[in-house]
Curated annotation (Swiss-Prot):
InterPro entries: F-box-assoc_dom (IPR007397), F-box-like_dom_sf (IPR036047), F-box_dom (IPR001810), F-box_only (IPR039752), Galactose-bd-like_sf (IPR008979)
Role this protein plays: Substrate-recognition component of the SCF (SKP1-CUL1-F-box protein)-type E3 ubiquitin ligase complex. Able to recognize and bind denatured glycoproteins, which are modified with complex-type oligosaccharides. Also recognizes sulfated glycans. Does not bind high-mannose glycoproteins.
UniProt source species: Mus musculus
Tissue specificity annotation: Expressed primarily in the brain.
Keywords: Ubl conjugation pathway
Keyword Ligase: no
GO cellular component terms listed in the entry, alphabetical order: cytoplasm; SCF ubiquitin ligase complex
Entry-linked PROSITE patterns: FBA, FBOX
Name of the protein described by the UniProt record: F-box only protein 17
Ranges of residues in domain FBA: 107-283
Length: 286
C-alpha cells in the first residue's frame, strides 16, 4: 500500500485544481473567502490570483450578498467605484500602503461602516492616537464615576484647572471609505461624545468637529458649548451628538477636538470628564 499524501500535498493538489478553473468561476469561488484570508492566503498564490484580489470583481460579489436596505444602496454606489481608485494616496499622490488594492478591496478589508473610527476613545491606551495640549496639571485618565452605556472601556479622560484640549484626525479614505463614495451625497458622518463632571466641582466643556478637505482646509464645522456644570450638581453623564449630511464634495478628514477645565481652579484633576468619543459613517437612505 502506498503512503498517504501529506496535508501539504493535499493542499497543493486543491490549489492546483482551483487554478485550472476559468476566471469567471474562480472569481465566484474566491468571493466566498473572508477578506483578510483573500489578502494573506489567496493573493500570494500566483499572479492571476493576485490580479483578481487586487481588482473589483471579487469585492463587488461580496458586497452584493448584503440584501439589507443599506447593503443594496451601498452596492449601487460600489458599482460606480473607479476600478483604479487611488485609495490611499496623500494630497501629492504618494501612496502609503503595501498592497495596490482597489478601493473596494480596502473598503471590505477595513469595514468602515458601523464601527467607531476614533481610536482609543476612552483612554484605555493612555493618550495614544490623540494630539494633546495640557493645561493646569494636564490631562489624566481615570475610571468612570458613572456607567457610560456602550463604551468599550469604563475609563475617561479628565481635565484640570486650566484649559486642556485634545484632537484626533480621522482619515476617512485611509479607514476604507473611497473618495467617490464620500462625494456621492449619500453618506452621513455621525459624531458623538460623552462628558460629565465631578459632584464636588463644576466644569466647562467644549466640542468642535470639523470636516476637512484633502489639504486639511475646513469645509463644515459643528460646535457644542453646553452650559457649565455647577458645583454640587447631580453627577451624571451627558451626550453631545450631531449628524453631518449634504456636506458636499471633497471631504477627506474629520478633526475631532475636545476642550475642558474646572470652574474652581483647584490643583489636580477636577475638570470636565470626556469619554466614548465616536465618528461613524453610514449610508443615507432617504
Amino acid at each position: 500500500m502506498g503512503a498517504r499524501p501529506s496535508r501539504r500535498q493535499m493542499t497543493e493538489a486543491r490549489r492546483l485544481a482551483l487554478t485550472k478553473l476559468p476566471p469567471e468561476l474562480l472569481v465566484q469561488v474566491l468571493s466566498h473567502v473572508p477578506p483578510r484570508a483573500l489578502v494573506t492566503r489567496c493573493r500570494p498564490v500566483c499572479r492571476a490570483w493576485r490580479d483578481l484580489v487586487d481588482g473589483p470583481s471579487i469585492w463587488l460579489l461580496q458586497l452584493a450578498r448584503d440584501r439589507s436596505a443599506e447593503g443594496r444602496a451601498l452596492y449601487a454606489l460600489a458599482q460606480r467605484c473607479p476600478a483604479d481608485a487611488d485609495a490611499d494616496a496623500d494630497a501629492d499622490g504618494n501612496r502609503h500602503d503595501e498592497f495596490p488594492f482597489c478601493a473596494l478591496a480596502r473598503f471590505c478589508l477595513r469595514a468602515p461602516f458601523g464601527r467607531n473610527l476614533i481610536h482609543n476613545s476612552c483612554g484605555e491606551q493612555g493618550f495614544r492616537g490623540w494630539e494633546v495640549e495640557h493645561g493646569g496639571n494636564g490631562w489624566a485618565v481615570e475610571k468612570n464615576l458613572t456607567l457610560v452605556p456602550g463604551a468599550p472601556s469604563q475609563t475617561c479622560f479628565v481635565t484640570s484647572f486650566e484649559w486642556c484640549s485634545k484632537r484626533q484626525l480621522v482619515d476617512l479614505v485611509k479607514e476604507g471609505v473611497w473618495q467617490e463614495l464620500l462625494d456621492s451625497g449619500q453618506i452621513e458622518i455621525c459624531i458623538a461624545d460623552w462628558w460629565g463632571a465631578r459632584e464636588n466641582c463644576g466644569c466647562i466643556y467644549r466640542l468642535r468637529v470639523r470636516l476637512l478637505d484633502e489639504y486639511e482646509n475646513e469645509v463644515v464645522k459643528f460646535s457644542a458649548s453646553p452650559n457649565p456644570v455647577l458645583q454640587w450638581t447631580e453627577r451624571s453623564c451627558r451626550q453631545v451628538s450631531h449628524v453631518f449630511t449634504n456636506f458636499g464634495k471633497g471631504i477627506r478628514y474629520v478633526s475631532f477636538e475636545q476642550y475642558g477645565r474646572d470652574t474652581r481652579s483647584w490643583v489636580g484633576h477636577y475638570g470636565a470628564l470626556v469619554t466614548h468619543s465616536s465618528v461613524r459613517v453610514r449610508i443615507r437612505l432617504s
